[in-house]
C-alpha cells in the first residue's frame, strides 16, 4: 500500500502505528487496526478491519463513532473493494484507501 501511496502523493508520505484513546469502545479496538498516515502538514488515521467479512453500514457507523473521538480525520483501509462497494462508499462520502490501489481522501483536497 505504501508504495502505491508514494506514487500518488510523493515520497514524503509515511504510515506508522497509532494508539487508540482510552475512551475508544472495545468493539473498535478489537475490530480494527489503526495506522497514522502522514503527508507534509496533513495527517489522518486509517482504520483497517481485522476480519475479512464486513458490512458497509457497520463500517460507516463505526468510522463515524471513531471520528467523534479522534482529533484527526479518519478513513477506512480495506484489502479488497468491489466496484459496487467503491461506488457506495463514494456516494456516501466515506473516505478510504484500498489495497487494490484506490484512494478517496476528500479532506486532503
Could you describe each region identified by the protein language model?
Residues 1-94:
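DNA-contacting interfaces and partner/effector-binding or oligomerization modules
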Residues 93-105:
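Charged, structured surface patches that assemble and position nucleic-acid processing machinery
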Amino acid at each position: 500500500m505504501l508504495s502505491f501511496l508514494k506514487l500518488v502523493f510523493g515520497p514524503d508520505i509515511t504510515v506508522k502505528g497509532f494508539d487508540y484513546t482510552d475512551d475508544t469502545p472495545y468493539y473498535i479496538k478489537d475490530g480494527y487496526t489503526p495506522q497514522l498516515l502522514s503527508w507534509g502538514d496533513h495527517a489522518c488515521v486509517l482504520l483497517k478491519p481485522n476480519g475479512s467479512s464486513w458490512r458497509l453500514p457497520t463500517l460507516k457507523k463505526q468510522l463515524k463513532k471513531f471520528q467523534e473521538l479522534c482529533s484527526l480525520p479518519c478513513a477506512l483501509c480495506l484489502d479488497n473493494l468491489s466496484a459496487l462497494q467503491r461506488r457506495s462508499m463514494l456516494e456516501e462520502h466515506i473516505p478510504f484507501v484500498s489495497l487494490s490501489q484506490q484512494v478517496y481522501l476528500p479532506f486532503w483536497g
